[in-house]
């Protein structure tokens, strides 16, 4: 399927809810209004959408929110989606707070991957930016995902003055775990949310800082299935790392021309 800009669209990003159990300062203003329940797509309608998208060439589906596990019946929806499409690449983006009880179900249905958002390894700062004291639960669920063998990527919004001092901790996590740790440039998300130039930490500056910690080698980007992240392997004094570093640069280096996603 090609759009009006002749981009090859084969990836569906489907938001199952706009509701979330966290109140991240860069995402939520605290004054938001939610879509009325009767106006939100029913799961049956989403299943029909996926069917139609696959008929048009979509090969990969990512389910997002809000927080998808905050919507009742989401795990059951994933089970039905997998049963209907055994070969479909199905992924989920989550904040990691509510996924725990569903991990064995996700393993059983063969969920392809999880993107998990975590901006800090500090409990106090986690509560500061999310408004919730759930850091321990997220770390517990990260370990459970690793134990279950479900591939996941760790996404962190990079912010000067907030988590730039934690770069060594993020790099160390990537060195010792077989996952991609990806930094996303801080960008404006809407009226009333926290954003300023002083907090912006560009992808090139992050990469320079990482090079002061470990050796990095760029990974050749996939032409068809590659996402917006530029990936790097890592090596330290004790040898190569188990994971990789990713940089996503919506502000300093736009990737819209290569976008392969339909967002609903």
Give a label for each model feature.
Residues 14, 79, 168, 204, ...:
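Active-site phosphate/pyrophosphate- and oxyanion-stabilizing loops and adjacent acidic/basic residues
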Residues 32-36, 122-129, 190-194:
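A short acidic, helix-capping loop that chelates divalent metal ions and anchors anionic groups
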């Amino acid at each position: 399927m090609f759009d009006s800009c002749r981009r090859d669209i084969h990836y569906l990003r489907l938001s199952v809810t706009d509701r979330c159990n966290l109140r991240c300062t860069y995402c939520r203003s605290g004054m938001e209004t939610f879509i009325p329940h009767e106006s939100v797509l029913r799961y049956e309608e989403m299943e029909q959408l996926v069917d139609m998208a696959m008929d048009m060439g979509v090969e990969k589906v990512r389910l997002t929110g809000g927080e998808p596990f905050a919507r009742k019946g989401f795990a059951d929806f994933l089970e039905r989606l997998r049963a209907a499409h055994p070969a479909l690449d199905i992924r989920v983006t989550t904040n990691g707070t509510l996924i725990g009880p569903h991990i064995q179900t996700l393993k059983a249905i063969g969920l392809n991957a999880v993107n998990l958002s975590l901006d800090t390894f500090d409990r106090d700062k986690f509560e500061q930016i999310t408004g919730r004291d759930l850091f321990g639960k997220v770390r517990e669920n990260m370990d459970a995902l690793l134990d279950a063998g479900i591939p996941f990527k760790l996404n962190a919004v990079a912010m000067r003055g907030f988590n730039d001092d934690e770069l060594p901790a993020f790099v160390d996590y990537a060195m010792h775990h077989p996952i991609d740790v990806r930094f996303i440039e801080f960008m404006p998300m809407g009226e009333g949310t926290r954003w300023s130039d002083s907090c912006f930490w560009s992808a090139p500056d992050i990469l320079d800082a990482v090079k002061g910690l470990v050796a990095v080698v760029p990974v050749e980007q996939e032409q068809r299935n590659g996402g917006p992240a530029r990936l790097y392997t890592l090596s330290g004094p004790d040898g190569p790392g188990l994971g990789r570093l990713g940089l996503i640069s919506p502000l300093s280096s736009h990737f819209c021309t290569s976008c392969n996603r339909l967002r609903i």
